Regions:
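A short glycine-rich, His/Asp/Glu-containing loop-to-beta-strand
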Residues: 9-66, 141, 146-185, 192
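Short, Gly/Pro- and small/polar-rich lid/capping loops
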Residues: 1-7
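Generic beta-strand structural signal
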Residues: 80, 86-88, 98, 112-116, ...
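Short, structured patches in soluble enzyme cores that scaffold and shape functional sites
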Residues: 117-124, 137, 155-157, 177-180, ...
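Ligand-binding loop in jelly-roll beta-barrel domains
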Residues: 93-126
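Short beta-strand segments
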Residues: 35, 65, 90-91, 117-121
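Long amphipathic alpha-helical segments that form oligomerization/scaffold cores
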Residues: 120-151
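Glycine- and acidic-residue-biased ligand/ion/polar-headgroup-sensing regions
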Residues: 57-77, 83-87, 93-97, 180-182, ...
Length: 199
């Protein structure tokens, strides 16, 4: 069955966030329970995102950027800036609090921000697991070019590649950049799958 979902747009302090899941048409896709696209936007000098500390339990968040930078801090003591192509995976498990802010150096000038954050439901057996945070630099992610497509496996397994990101359930999360005449078949090894089209 094919379902087409138009993301709902929210304005968060001058930054547009498009939420595709959950909706009435799809409460989740596989383990993905939230799918948010941030931007694309250019934030003015002296401004940025300021998501204050807030808690999560029983899930994991995955952050991936195409442009810009976000500083992540959490109650485990993690303090990490994510940049384009990197992956931040935060396992909330039995509980974690974190904040996300534009780093000070970025605020010194106009700066772009474009990214995706997904929330993944942990299996019942892992809902109370210890909280954890892992940063994976862009160079550590499997990449391949085929048929005019550039594939980066963010999390899980696809196209014969496996991401170093530790997952708790069968996960398919791949960034695909297509040339104008490129084409790619979606990996069919997953019962539920979706395609989020940026442009």
């Amino acid at each position: 069955m094919t379902t087409i979902i138009a993301p709902r747009v929210h304005d968060i302090g001058g930054l547009q966030v498009r939420r595709a899941v959950p909706t009435l048409q799809a409460r989740s896709v596989g383990p993905f329970v939230f799918v948010d696209q941030m931007g694309p936007a250019v934030l003015g000098a002296g401004t940025g995102i300021d998501v204050r500390p807030h808690p999560h339990i029983g899930l994991a968040t995955v952050t991936f950027l195409w442009s810009g930078a976000i500083g992540h801090r959490d109650t485990l003591g993690s303090d990490q800036v994510i940049r384009p192509g990197d992956v931040n995976w935060m396992t909330a498990g039995r509980g974690i609090a974190h904040s996300e802010r534009t780093p000070p150096v970025e605020r010194e000038h106009d700066h772009p921000l474009h990214g995706m954050q997904t929330w993944i439901a942990l299996p019942r057996s892992a809902e109370e697991t210890d909280p954890a945070f892992h940063h994976h630099a862009a160079a550590t992610l499997p990449q391949q070019r085929r048929n005019g497509a550039w594939l980066r496996v963010i999390a899980g397994r696809a196209y014969g590649e496996e991401s170093p990101v530790k997952v708790f359930s069968d996960t398919l999360n791949v960034a695909i950049d297509l040339d104008p005449d490129g084409e790619i078949d979606l990996d069919t090894g997953h019962v539920e799958r979706s395609l989020y089209i940026l442009e």
